[in-house]
A protein has these predicted regions:
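Short, well-ordered alpha-helices that flank and scaffold nucleotide-derived cofactor binding pockets
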Residues: 57, 82, 86, 141, ...
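A phosphate-binding catalytic loop at a beta-strand-loop-alpha-helix junction
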Residues: 130-139, 143
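Hydrophobic Val/Ile/Leu positions in short beta-strands of Rossmann-like dinucleotide-binding domains
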Residues: 69, 125-126
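Conserved acidic residues
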Residues: 65, 121, 151
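Short, glycine/charge-rich flexible loops or terminal/linker lids adjacent to PRPP-binding catalytic cores
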Residues: 74-124, 131-134
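Active-site-facing substrate-recognition patch
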Residues: 1-63, 203-209
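PRPP-dependent phosphoribosyltransferase catalytic core
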Residues: 2-10, 140-209
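Short glycine-rich phosphate-binding loop at a beta-alpha junction
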Residues: 62-72
Length: 209
């Protein structure tokens, strides 16, 4: 599977790269025809810092108190907070970086000690990859519960442009991967044609079948 990987560079910054592997993959709520590998961006500080700088440029005029990191984006989130605090409307600000917990029914929650970082705050969602937007929907439900104000959605890769009226600013989009498709399991043409699933995919990575 790995031998099929192709490297894609971000427009305007060749230091920011993702890997894409064509195939048949199953997530919790969809089937997709590409695995988007963001491992280096989420684990390597050099690329994470470059990605954070690129994302921060979009929000220089947006007041942000807190960044909620989803899908292992904490390193990028920390550099993003640093970049936001260096210039623009957030210059000098101590931007918070938090990660929600998932409870027994897969809802995002915050414990009492971190709720104050959300309640009444201007919040930016940072997510690794968006295919259907369902993870964003869960995060938005969480924000409403804790009275946070969503001011933006930032992503490394997104197959959609917006979610419930909020634009998704992504470093990589469907323009970089025009053949990217997502299907419900019942409507997946790869399943219907008998193509076996290559791997199970979640926010941590993939497991071959």
């Amino acid at each position: 599977m790995e031998e099929r990987m192709q490297i894609i560079q971000a427009a305007g910054n060749s230091k920011i790269q993702i890997g894409v592997i064509p195939g048949h993959y199953a997530t919790n709520h969809s089937h997709i025809n590409y695995y988007v590998d963001i491992t280096s961006l989420k684990t390597g500080y050099k690329m994470a810092k470059e990605a954070a700088k690129a994302l921060a440029a979009t929000y220089v005029s947006t007041h942000i108190d807190t960044i909620i990191c989803l899908e292992g984006t904490e390193i990028i989130g920390a550099f993003l907070a640093e970049s936001l605090g260096e210039s623009g409307i957030n210059s000098g600000a101590d931007v918070n970086v938090v990660t929600p917990e998932l409870n027994a029914v897969n809802q995002m929650i915050f414990r009492d000690n971190t709720q104050k970082k959300i309640w009444g705050k201007q919040v930016l969602l940072l997510i690794a990859s968006v295919s259907t937007g369902k993870s964003i929907n869960r995060a938005m439900d969480c924000l409403k519960y804790y009275n946070g104000n969503l001011v933006g959605i930032a992503s490394i890769f997104s197959a959609i442009k917006e979610n419930h009226g909020t634009a998704i600013h992504a470093l990589f989009t469907e323009k970089d991967l025009p053949d990217y498709m997502t299907y419900t399991s019942s409507e997946c043409p790869m399943c219907k044609s008998g193509q076996k699933v290559d791997a199970l995919v979640n926010s941590f990575g993939y497991s071959k079948i």
